[in-house]
Amino acid sequence: MTEPVRFARREDIPGLKALWRRCFPGEPEEAERFFETFFAGDTFILWEEAGEPVSMAALLPCRLRLGEERLPMRYVYALCTHPDFRRGGRAAALLRFAEEAMAARGVAALCLLPDSEKLLRYYEALGWRRAFHVPAGGSGAPGGGDTLEYPEEYAAYDDWLQALDPGEPAELPGLMKDLVPGLPAELHAAMPRPMN
């Protein structure tokens, strides 16, 4: 049986917003702002059950600087599964789909920022490696000084979120998954030193 994973379409947005609000019960306008800012043809993937999304992730475009070269990269954001459908391998299937689909599009790597030690161990068990960190008080978007570049709307969205809930700043480990075989060793050396 093939997995019901696919790229999201415009008509999926209401279901994706409902899933977002169920998994991330913060400010109600957050889902509206996020989808208005980031929805595009290949930026959202979902797992569908009975015509409704039960697991999703955003694959936000960014670039990895490697010397003078700029490599396309995707920032995996808002990976979530409805509580009634957890522990069925759906998130792992979404990540596999993301790896295959983005590699086919020439994307060099995926990155993400797990917000707990439990998630960090989960992603590492799936083959992700620690590659950078976002210092306390830094942007929630992938950082790393001059190593990662992301569009201005990411920073604007992150600033908007911080204004909604300033909270305590935390240092976050960043994980990467290489999609292109034989990426140069400088890729790893260029990334800021990961947290221990």
Language-model segments: residues:
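A conserved beta-strand-loop-helix scaffold within acyl/acetyltransferase catalytic domains
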Residues: 5-79, 181-196
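Alpha-helical elements of Rossmann-like donor-binding domains used by nucleotide-donor carbohydrate transfer enzymes
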Residues: 15, 19, 93, 97, ...
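Non-catalytic interaction surface on structured domains
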Residues: 61, 82, 87-88, 123
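Conserved acetyl-CoA-binding loop-helix of GNAT-fold acetyltransferases
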Residues: 78-81, 87-100
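Conserved GNAT acetyl-CoA-binding A-motif
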Residues: 95, 102-115
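Conserved functional hotspot residues or short segments at active or partner-binding sites
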Residues: 118
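Amide-forming acyltransferase catalytic core, primarily the GNAT-like/NAT-type
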Residues: 127-196
